[in-house]
Amino acid sequence: MPFVVVITGIPGVGKSTITRLALQRTRAKFRVVNFGDIMFQEAVKAGWVSHRDEVRKLSLKVQRELQLKAAQRILEISQKEPVLLDTHATIKTPLGYMLGFPREVIEVINPRFMVIIEANPSEILGRRLRDLKRDRDVETEDQIQRHQDLNRAATISYAMHSNALIKIIENHEDKGLEEAVNELVKILDLAVNEDA
């Protein structure tokens, strides 16, 4: 039976770092799949983009097509091994925010658990400014908070369509990365035990 745990958070929240460190400590065995990477691979194959950050600037129709292709690939993988899906619940596009999982996509992936990583907007802004590898939009702290609020709302909607459980993990500078990683390890261990 397919088994997917979604981990989401807005760019700069520390989602990928927390995921990487948690997987080194958990007893559970997951294959990490990045939803955006699969969309990017499909877009490159089609000749639409050459850089990952260009995907979110494609037309909504093309992005939705890429989302569905990615979902189908993830389903195939999850039928063979548990998947930890690193993704975004909402994507900021030039026209507004797009759902990371439209109904037809969430129904294909059908996750068991959804983990949201959050932080204070000032922390996220600082992390984004230090990350020179990515072409990130410049946003105010208010815009960052709005994006996090949209992520929560979207994740609740996804859970309604998949019956997934939701967990929010805070990744604050003062709280420490270690605590956030430990929380994710607990969730991953419980998720696999819950499925057994």
UniProtKB/Swiss-Prot annotation:
Pfam family, any one: AAA_17
The protein's gene is named: adkA
Q: Provide a Gene Ontology MF annotation, just one.
A: ATP binding
Q: Does the keyword Kinase apply?
A: yes
Q: Please report the organism this UniProt entry assigns to the protein.
A: Thermococcus sibiricus (strain DSM 12597 / MM 739)
Which annotated residues bind ATP? 9-17
**What family name appears in the similarity comment?**
Belongs to the archaeal adenylate kinase family.
Q: Which UniProt keywords apply?
A: ATP-binding, Cytoplasm, Kinase, Nucleotide-binding, Transferase
- The source's superkingdom equals Archaea
Give the EC class as a word. Answer: transferase
Q: What is its main location?
A: cytoplasm
Q: What is its EC number?
A: 2.7.4.3
Name assigned to this protein: Adenylate kinase
What is one GO cellular-component annotation here?
Answer: cytoplasm
Subcellular localization, per the record? Answer: Cytoplasm
Listed under catalytic activity are:
AMP + ATP = 2 ADP
Classification via HAMAP family: Adenylate_kinase_AdkA
